C-alpha cells in the first residue's frame, strides 16, 4: 500500500542558471548545494570538468560520481533502466557525436560504481517514488526530453520558449533533446509537478504529472533520476 503524503510540498532551493549549452546537469547539482558548496564548484568550472573526467559532456553517472567525490556527506541514489550506454543511441542524432568519446568512460563508471560507493538501482522509478521522495527527503534531478516538457506558466508552450536554440543542451534540433531539471515540489490534488529549469533565470515551472512522465520516460533519457536528500529546514520555504 502506498503511503499517505502531503498535498503540497515545495523545497526552497537556490536557482542556478546554466552558463553554456551543455551544463544543465551540473547546474541542477548546484541547485542542490548550499552557498559554500556551490562556490567550491563554480570557482573554476573548466578545471572541475577536467578533474572529474567528463569535460563538456556530462552523463547522469558523471553527476553521481562528482557528488560522491566532492560531497560525500550528501545522501543520494540513482535509478536508471540502462546500466551503461544503450547501443541503440548510435542512430540518434543527439547522441551520435558524443558516443564515440564517452562510451568507454560511461561503461567503466557503471562497472565500478559499487566500489566507488555510487548507489545505482536498475529499474524504472514510478511517479509515486518521486513524489514520496520530494514529500519526505529532498529533490530529484531528472533527465527529460525537453521537446516534450511543457510548462503551464511560461510565455510559450516550451520551457525553452523563444530561446530553445540557445538554451537547449548541445544546441541541436532533434526529436530527442536531453535536458536536466530539478523536481522540487508538487501539488497532489491538482496533479502538478513543480520544477526548476536551469535554462531559465530564477523561476519555478509547473506541469502536469502526465506531461512530466512523458518527458522523463521518453526514449533517450534511460529514465534517469537522482534522488537527493536535503536539509529538512529547506522544506516548504
Model-found features: residue ranges?
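Noncatalytic regulatory segments and standalone regulatory/sensor domains
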Residues: 1, 134-141, 145-237
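A generic short-segment signal for beta-strand/edge and adjacent turn/coil regions
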Residues: 43-46, 108-113, 143, 193-197
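Generic detector of short, locally flexible boundary/turn motifs and exposed helical patches
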Residues: 5-9, 39-42, 104-109, 155-162, ...
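Predominantly the structural core of cysteine protease catalytic domains
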Residues: 63-64, 68-175, 226
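Active-site nucleophile-adjacent alpha helix/oxyanion-hole segment immediately C-terminal to the catalytic cysteine
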Residues: 1-84, 132-136
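Short, well-structured alpha-helical interface segments that form or flank functional binding sites
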Residues: 19, 58, 62, 125, ...
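Helix N-cap and loop-to-helix transition residues
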Residues: 24, 41-42, 59, 126-127, ...
